[in-house]
Amino acid sequence: MSSIQGKGTAGPSPEGIPNSREDGEMNPEGVTISGQTVSFTSVSKSASADDIQQVALPIIQSDSLASSPILGGAIGEIEVADMVAEVVENNEANVQQLDEDLEAIFQAIDAGEEQLESLEVKNKSSLKGVRYSSGRHGMDRNKSSSLSPERTRLANIRTSLRSTASRMRHHAGLVSSSLADLQKQLRSISQEDLKAALGKDSEAVLSRLRKLGLDVNKKGEWRLRTNGDIGRLNQSIHDLSLLVENVNDEGILSLNKEASEEEVNACCSSGSKACQFLQEHLMSALRAIYQQILRFLNWISRKIGVGSKRTDDYYTRPGVFTNPYASYLGANPPINDPRSLRERLRGGGALSGEDTLFSMPQDDSVDSESVSDDDRGSR
């Protein structure tokens, strides 16, 4: 089975596979107040005012949303009449990068499971030492301080972990639902008409669909395969979210009222690292993959002339433009960063033999209350 190469640039034909990364030079990188590096795609001198506006608009909207102290980079809505279709068209997914990005997120999920399991083992060992040194006196003293700042912080961390696990499943479910929507749409068009609509890129597009998990059986019917990339992604995210919930509800973070202050602090330290790891690495990677796949499926829907209600509603509502980059830009480099998802997630540095794709953050401080639920999950 052929597949789309993970590197290279798309051809200049307007009928080609959508490519969101521009081929032009990149302007010098800037650094936001939060310390994030941002690169902006340069605009040619011959670009019209409308072209410049279409490039600048998502950036302006994302920056304003990412700086919101309340939303914390959550997806927001900005009133922009008559601009929806153009902006969406100019921000199509870079399908050619999808293979490498999918492989990166599968490795990220595996690394996340290893980190959580290792975290639980290490923290159990540290808690044994804490219990031994604190003695019964410390536990008795803590009985009367069940609402201490340490316990409040631990409660917030556990709430954030539960929310993160739910959002991971939600995002994975959105990808699966979008593929199911496209399957229904393709039933209304013959194979010949589909290839004609897709043009010269039809074989590459169909190969990508097969790899994602949508294929035609011997009877000529479109069928979903659970062993495709989307099915694997959905199952992997589901397993990881269950592990997160287990660590949170039955593992190292499930302390009783007799736990000492030292035990609570130890759990806060481990829990905050896990929370930061999941929110800043895995969730941002999952959003990036979801956005790429969704744009690819939406692009096919547009090519065959059958709009998807789910994907169209995600981007458009009457007079409203929903910015798909706001969450991603809130804590990570922009989607048009020339580096691959793998390079962005591991900081762009070379990995030594002892390094893993992801490493647990060293900073123990995580403001769990500043992480808002994803906008799409709360609708």
Swiss-Prot record:
Give the originating organism.
Chlamydia muridarum (strain MoPn / Nigg)
Q: Where is this region: Disordered?
A: 1-37, 130-150, 332-379
State the similarity comment. Answer: Belongs to the chlamydial CPn_0499/CT_392/TC_0671 family.
Q: What is this protein called?
A: Uncharacterized protein TC_0671
